[in-house]
Amino acid sequence: LSSGATATTARAFSAADLRAFAGLSGTHAGAHVPEPLIAGLVSYLLGVQLPGRGTNYLKQELEFHAAAPLDTEITATVEVTRLRPEKCLVDLWARCALPDGTELCAGRALVKAPAGMFPASGA
């Protein structure tokens, strides 16, 4: 775990995915991918890749700029911007975009990572 480290994942959501989400959330399936599904890609990265297993999600702030069409790959990226090993905290920048570069959302996240993930202080 180091400042500047990144992780990326990509996924396209189908009409069937939206119907399943609508059934779980009590909403209706629309013509675009719902923002919570897009934000879920960031959540996945934080819990599975960076920092990864054992991470405790504290805060996420995403500002959405565009709608995501169905069956179009969405790429989510997170980057470590600050490490606070004394508190086991990690600040990250997050972004989701379409293949043409259109930014769907961007923002930040704060997580608590297991102490063993931080580099030794050298003290």
Language-model features, listed with the residues they occupy:
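Hot-dog-fold acyl-thioester-processing enzymes
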Residues: 1-55, 59, 118-123
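HotDog/MaoC-like acyl-thioester-processing domains
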Residues: 3, 70-123
